[in-house]
């Protein structure tokens, strides 16, 4: 269930609500983040296509995403993420404002401005790398599925990497070791929020003369 920052506004005084209004994310920030995430996803998707081309013996083939349907899916994922990230920030912004009010009930505009100016960079310092990692790994997992589905070359095996985990699902996959490639592609990464895992694939090579025919994002 999404965090409800609007519910916290009812606990604020006028000064705190004004502070939240001034600092919270809205459509413009969300749209900027959507564009950034789409760029991250697109680059990761294209790079993964190149990696998988190398895995089937066609090193040097570069991914170039021109498929509108796939680009649309990457954009939808980026838009969902941007809205979720915005909502989460606005919630914890409200929590921080209420905490600041408990610390200094008589705090004025300058007090709240300084408090949020100190808090926000710390929040984003750990959040942004996490956001980028999720965008990259989900795009790579999608590229793996599309590459082998469209090229019809899903023969081989895969292991989940990195080989350390705390999530029971990830631990289970790691314990299984190498699994058939088709099984891996049917169970793409991102098994839980902020999952760092992705399949490392060993695939059967295609004939050299077929390398120019590989689908690489068109």
Regions found by a protein language model. Name each.
Residues 1-139, 151-152, 203-218:
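N-terminal leader/targeting and assembly helices and adjacent pre-domain segments
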């Amino acid at each position: 269930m999404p965090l409800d920052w609007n519910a916290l506004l009812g606990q604020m005084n006028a000064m705190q609500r004004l502070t939240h209004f001034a600092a919270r994310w809205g459509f413009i920030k969300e749209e900027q983040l959507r564009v950034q995430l789409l760029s991250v996803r697109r680059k990761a998707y294209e790079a993964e296509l190149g990696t998988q081309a190398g895995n089937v013996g066609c090193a040097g083939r570069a991914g170039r995403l021109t498929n509108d349907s796939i680009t649309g899916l990457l954009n939808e994922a980026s838009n969902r993420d941007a809205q979720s990230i915005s909502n989460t920030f606005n919630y914890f912004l409200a929590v921080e404002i209420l905490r600041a009010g408990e610390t200094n009930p008589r705090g004025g505009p300058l007090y709240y401005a300084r408090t949020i100016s100190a808090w926000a960079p710390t929040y984003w310092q750990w959040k942004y790398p996490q956001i980028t990692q999720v965008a990259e790994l989900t795009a790579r997992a999608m590229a793996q599925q599309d590459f082998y589905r469209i090229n019809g070359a899903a023969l081989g095996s895969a292991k989940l990497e990195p080989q350390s985990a705390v999530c029971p699902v990830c631990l289970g996959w790691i314990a299984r070791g190498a699994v058939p490639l088709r099984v891996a592609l049917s169970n793409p990464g991102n098994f839980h929020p902020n999952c760092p895992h992705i399949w490392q694939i060993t695939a059967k090579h295609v004939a050299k003369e077929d390398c120019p025919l590989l689908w690489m994002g068109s």
